[in-house]
Amino acid sequence: MGLVLHPRRDCSPAVGQVAAWTSTHDVELVASIDDVTRLALPGLTALSVEELASTCDGIIALGGDGTLLGAMRLVSGRPVPVLGVNFGNLGFLAEVEGADLDAALSKMAEGRSTVERRGCLVVGHGGGESLAFNDVVLARVPGEGMVEANLSVSGRRYGHYRCDALILATPMGSTAYSYAAGGPVVSPGTDGILVTPSAPLNGIARSVLLGPGEPLRLELTGGRPAFELDGVLTGRLDAGETVTVDWRHDAGLLVRIDGSRAADRSRVKLSLLDLPVLPAELLELVPEHLRRGFER
């Protein structure tokens, strides 16, 4: 069993929980050399990132949604089930909260979990390919002009965008930046590419969902936007550069502890985003008698 940890948060207590569980089930627990060294984790086998990706039968990602996405990219060449454990804010993609880790591990051991398949975006730029399980974003940089791009679908011109940001999202990523820009929520079990402009000035002004067999090509015609994959800045784009985006089926495997409640959890979390408070302030909205019930 491999561990992928948030690069800054101290998840040592959770690592101890996982280590105790693996030791009682005769499972070897491994992590990257960097994580083992950074947190001085005893009893873990330290592997290179390449060894971790090629030898694990499963991954537990401790952190937030970004940690989970990184774990899925890590094993995308040989997909294995990934369990996301949230130690961040709302955690749309992570399956369980940190406080529920022990219960989740018990259910996995008892065979009371399932695995769902996820597709991803294959992004071509500059002669190389990268993967994105959430989204690809071309974002306006102050002083560099708006994002201007022509979109072609299956080799045919589709339309033009002029906006502050252009987001190409997977269905799983439809609850992230695309949703904040007014895009729809798409069932994560759907195959397809969601294209959403943020603050469009002219051109296409609405989200469109394109099929998995419709490769996309973006040609930048203006601006010098930042180029992000799954929230990670990878560089800047110049006018005349192109980005291709295609769909890859079954690129990742997600562990579900209670799949029947996944839609309910997402709906509640999306509703919380509409409240004018920070996630840490949400508890203040809960009546005191209900809070006492939670504490018991």
Write out the residue ranges for each language-model feature.
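ATP/NTP phosphate-donor binding region
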Residues: 1-58, 70, 99-114, 125-129
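Redox-cofactor binding/interface segments in oxidoreductases and associated redox assembly factors
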Residues: 3, 61, 168
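Short glycine-rich anion-binding loops that position phosphate/pyrophosphate groups of nucleotides
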Residues: 7, 65-67, 90, 172-174
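Short glycine/serine/threonine-rich phosphate/pyrophosphate-binding segments
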Residues: 11-14, 66-72, 175-179
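Gly/Ser/Thr-rich active-site loops/lids in small-molecule metabolic enzymes
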Residues: 146, 156-204
